[in-house]
Amino acid sequence: AIMKVLPHRPPFLLVDKILELSDTHIVGMKSITMNEPYFAGHFPGQPVMPGVLQIEAMAQAGGVLVLNTVPDPENYLTFFMKIENAKFKNPVVPGDTLIFKMELLSPIRRGICHMQAVAYSRGRVTTEAEMMAQIVRKDQVKV
């Protein structure tokens, strides 16, 4: 169901499952396995999920939240606009289940979504950030 909404595909699809979805929040998860391609180099012998990929996983779940507001999400792309106050508090390693929750900080207007994002693993906060994204119809995107 996630791939019906998001254009991302493995190995860059970083959301395994949506656990909760409302008009104002979303909770997603990603099981972190040793098979993740980035562990080959980050870091050999001591694998740690890169913080930027934790941010990306949260952004992808946020994309599901905002795309859920239109009847035809397959006709839209989500663009990351801004990230503020990102903090990386605890490492995410193979065997962890990363749970990420995004809550709207204000109502979605003109396809713009402003969210507070927090990721958890093993009962601890791993990452938090404020994010802003916008959905745009694919036929209006100039590449």
Give the positions of each predicted feature.
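Catalytic strand-loop segment that frames the active site of acyl-thioester-processing enzymes
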Residues: 10-49, 54
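Short aromatic-glycine motifs in intrinsically disordered, low-complexity regions
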Residues: 1-9, 75
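Short solvent-exposed loop/turn micro-motifs enriched in small/polar/acidic residues
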Residues: 11-12, 85, 110-112
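HotDog/MaoC-like acyl-thioester-processing domains
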Residues: 92-143
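Active-site helix/loop of acyl-thioester processing domains in fatty-acid/polyketide metabolism
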Residues: 18, 49-73
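Hydrophobic beta-strand-centered segment that forms part of the acyl-chain substrate-binding groove
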Residues: 62-101, 126, 133-134
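Conserved positions in beta-strands of structured domains
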Residues: 16-19, 84, 89, 103-105, ...
